[in-house]
Amino acid sequence: MVLDLDLFRVDKGGDPALIRETQEKRFKDPGLVDQLVKADSEWRRCRFRADNLNKLKNLCSKTIGEKMKKKEPVGDDESVPENVLSFDDLTADALANLKVSQIKKVRLLIDEAILKCDAERIKLEAERFENLREIGNLLHPSVPISNDEDVDNKVERIWGDCTVRKKYSHVDLVVMVDGFEGEKGAVVAGSRGYFLKGVLVFLEQALIQYALRTLGSRGYIPIYTPFFMRKEVMQEVAQLSQFDEELYKVIGKGSEKSDDNSYDEKYLIATSEQPIAALHRDEWLRPEDLPIKYAGLSTCFRQEVGSHGRDTRGIFRVHQFEKIEQFVYSSPHDNKSWEMFEEMITTAEEFYQSLGIPYHIVNIVSGSLNHAASKKLDLEAWFPGSGAFRELVSCSNCTDYQARRLRIRYGQTKKMMDKVEFVHMLNATMCATTRTICAILENYQTEKGITVPEKLKEFMPPGLQELIPFVKPAPIEQEPSKKQKKQHEGSKKKAAARDATLENRLQNMEVTDA
């Protein structure tokens, strides 16, 4: 995931100042741009020198061949004139005045210089890439410039009644319909582990079927992705911070052979976007085949580092969940990817409108965008039981930022003298099932249970097509008694502590009096 290096090269029509401005608008270090430009300039000089040295080496070989053909004496003198050692002034005429033995010595010295130059070039290339991969994509002009998404995310539009309030939050409702085992899930799987069961399993499957059917009717190809990816491929689709904060690493045998003791490092996917992005890695995509639209279905795995204390109960923010994703490869020409961007967010909106979930669309501030996104719109649903908007959908246009690292090119082959173009890649959530379930539970709650949304009824089993009944009391209504019990126990402990302190004081007084 990187920008085009030519954007940093003034002589290639690039504008480093524009990229510095983008970094500043993203509230990231603009100094990375200067470091990259410096490393790239040195790299280009080094490559130019290496090219010249290789030409000189070839010239040496050619001159030796000509002298041998003329049967000139080889000679045994390996001393080389000072003016030849600089290589910069080395010409065919200068070589012609040397013996074969001297030219061989020059060629050997050139080989050493090439090795030294190559080592320096590799070092500079690594330095350049380290900076390049931490510089974000160019921003779309409509992105709000701010580093505070809580205040400055721009609301683009609202659908439905986002003021209504209801009694219970999803944390209580998943228990009331007996569709969730949280404590046992945590014992088995650790923090945020859970079992989804009973009616909520059917509701999740209904959402998956409805989402896939909706996308299928719009020309999307359903695709069920691998759950893990090789490290070298994941490095091409994920930014560096994700390896520390989001991705789970899996270590396994390198092959199925029993005598193979090698180990392979892989990463569990955080979204089907990652494997689908790599699906056409190293390919040329024909213009007439675009756009290619995929409806990705996968289980997703996320560490959620940095979210400690947030949404610790229920199923809204968990380490493992199912998700249907929109992913599109688009033409880089004629604003096609931005037209597709609007189409994808519209598809998501119409899906949630059909489910009767109120929401607003927010334009995410520059400081909260990941490196790849040129622009991101979120669909945040209204949760009437929680009294808050919660994110259900993220829609991003990454332009050619991802495709460049994955080498997914636009066109059939590289034409002579033409610059290679890369496809644009876009992604948008269609349905993260656990979050959508939470939104449905809060919006469709009644006194007796959860009314099943009209569009999901045909996918639910008999007896659950109209109403999902409450079968357990709300945990929040049991909590006061628990709190009172804890308060009572706390009062007893405090009283015991006071008594112990008083007794100690009395004993001290007795000792003093004595």
Curated annotation (Swiss-Prot):
Pfam families: Seryl_tRNA_N, tRNA-synt_2b. InterPro entries: aa-tRNA-synt_IIb, aa-tRNA-synth_II, aa-tRNA-synth_II/BPL/LPL, Ser-tRNA-ligase_type_1, Ser-tRNA-synth_1_N, SerRS_1_N_sf, SerRS_core, tRNA-bd_arm. It comes from the Eukaryota. It comes from Pongo abelii (Sumatran orangutan). Gene3D superfamilies: Bira Bifunctional Protein, Domain 2, Serine-tRNA synthetase, tRNA binding domain. Residues 9-61 are annotated as: Interaction with tRNA. The gene is SARS1. It is found in: Cytoplasm; Nucleus. CDD domains: SerRS_core. Residues 479-502 have a biased composition (Basic and acidic residues). This is Serine--tRNA ligase, cytoplasmic.
